[in-house]
Design a protein with these regions (language model features):
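Core catalytic region of metal-dependent phosphoesterases/phosphodiesterases
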Residues: 1-45
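Active-site environment of divalent metal-dependent phosphoester hydrolases
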Residues: 7-11, 28-34, 57-62, 78-89, ...
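Binuclear metal-dependent phosphoesterase catalytic core
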Residues: 45-46, 72-74, 89, 96-127
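Mid-chain, well-packed structural core segment of small domains
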Residues: 47-79
Length: 127
């Protein structure tokens, strides 16, 4: 799963050559990537409803917008944009931002792992 800012179509091609990729577009993506990817995506995996979006705004604004749009409507709401990890349960919804592989805004660069066995949970892995 990729939460936006793939940047170029060449990166998209490389990622999809490795495995199946579910992704949304981000604000830094080139037009050819934006034409192929939507800003929001909804999936059902492991019996759970998952919303994916890149997001916008600062940390508190992004989380507030995610809560308003998705709280108690999906099991997992995933977002990017802020480059700051978030892993919190609010109501029945897990809000998850894995941070950023590059250019972390706070702390270390990171990626995330989403677990869908039993109740959804997530990990932020610092690199």
């Amino acid at each position: 799963m990729h939460l936006g800012d793939i940047i170029t179509f060449e990166v998209w091609e490389y990622l999809t050559s490795l495995c199946q990729v579910e992704a949304v577009s981000g604000n830094c993506d080139m037009p050819d990537v934006r034409r192929r990817l939507k800003p929001k995506k909804f999936l059902e995996m492991g019996g759970f409803k998952i919303a994916m979006t890149h997001g916008n705004g600062g940390v508190s604004e992004a989380l507030k917008a995610m809560k308003q749009e998705y709280e108690d409507k999906v099991d997992v709401a995933m977002f990017g944009h802020t480059h700051v990890p978030c892993n919190m349960q609010q109501g029945k919804t897990l809000f998850f931002n894995p941070g950023s592989l590059k250019n972390a805004r706070i702390g270390h660069n990171s990626y995330g792992i989403l677990h869908l066995d039993g109740k959804p949970s997530a990990e932020v892995i610092e690199i």
